[in-house]
Amino acid sequence: MFIFGAIALLVDMQAHAQEEVIDTAQFLAVYDYQCKTQNNEGETVVDAMEVVVQVGRTMTKSMPWSQSSLREPTFEAEGKFYQETYLHMPTVWIGWPEGQTTSRELIFPNEFEGKEPTPELQWTLTDDTLRVGDYLCQKATTTYRGLTWQAYYTEEIPSSAGPWRLRGLPGLIVKAESGAHSFVLTQVLQQSEPITYKPNPEARQLSYKKLLKYRTDIYGNKQYVKNPVYYLPEFNELMKTIPNAQVTVLKQFDALFVNWMPVLHKGHVYQPLEKE
């Protein structure tokens, strides 16, 4: 609880000091994201986290639950926060800047940001229907960067938004699946709140193509599962700063926290959302 409280305080302090309001959310869509993979012993596991999407007038912002206004400083929340570390889910602004998609993520020990023109997903609409929760949905399919997706959308919520980078259908995406990955809508919250972008001068700026390659090279390496920081010098001291990264590493009990963000001792096999 101490760690999560410190994280929340740090995030709030940074946000109030630097963030820019770039749109206003009309509602929030909360998704359960699950990924089937293997742990460092080769056992099948299902990692899960919540993804929160702010749906604005001109843009959307998809983010891990811990980066959203829904986070809470509770013991249960601390476990959810740690679970996010296995899944490498970035924060994605679609439509910021105008016509662009911006992706930001921590690849220890640095934060990275990549931009690209917003890609248009080429969906094939079908007559198939499925009831997902309270919504009657229609099926659509697309292939996006090496993965084929089956998505179900509802025209009951007239928005082209969806989780992560999935978008562009005649209604809100309620469910989307591709191989190891699945997103399922769990809540629609009718609340208005600012959509923000916080400039980070320390973030490493790359083209999105280069960021995607770097992410795949790091997490896709076979060494990652046994030692998630295989590509960095060993560190065992209680606290130290890694050269040129401008981050602080804290060791508490059997966990490591970098700028209050958890770092894994053992990883899970990387299942990329984008392969090309």
Each predicted region: which residue ranges?
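Alpha-helix initiation and capping sites
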Residues: 145, 166-170, 179
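Short helix-loop boundary/capping segments
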Residues: 148-167, 186-187
